[in-house]
Amino acid sequence: MKLRQLEIALQRCAGFERPRASREQYQTPATLAARLLYDAFVSGDIAEKTVMDLGCGTGILAIGAALLGAREVRGTDIDPEALRTAEKNAALLGADVTFIAADVGSTEKIDPCDTVVMNPPFGAQKQNIHADRPFIDCALAIAPVTYGIFNAGSTAFVEAYIAGRGNITGRVAGTFSLKRSFTFHTRDLQEIPVEILRIVRA
């Protein structure tokens, strides 16, 4: 499957029915999801690998990994409603994915894998500052390789946070197209600069 084909397929994934701002539940844009997954694919980190989507939401990254030939794909989230949507999305696209209700803070409930893919919260809400840290910690605990979407300019923070535990071996700039989802949003569409980081466990 080519990059454009993957993007078109992922555009069929439904988003959150009732997103929660406190959890920063925003649907990962198909273009950005496809970019992350295809970079992982060409690096040999998807095909015939076991892949985990941490904080999978409605499943777009997990489903994309399955479409690219992962041997086994699991997605985990704490929101049962999002997981139900994820299961519907996977069925729609014929993707074999197992979705699990689990908190990233409970790594003992999450099986090890070859590759983690994730779009963790950016910590944009006051009650959610540093919300990406448990995701990074969990990823390093369960997988040797991680691909994550972070706010642009996060590389230095992530490097410092994982010092001694892992290294950033790849960085790709991207854009998160954020549609109006909540009453406090002032624009119908906002383009947020992001970066996709490849993290390898030390």
What are these regions (language model features)?
Residues 1-202:
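Class I S-adenosyl-L-methionine-dependent methyltransferase catalytic core
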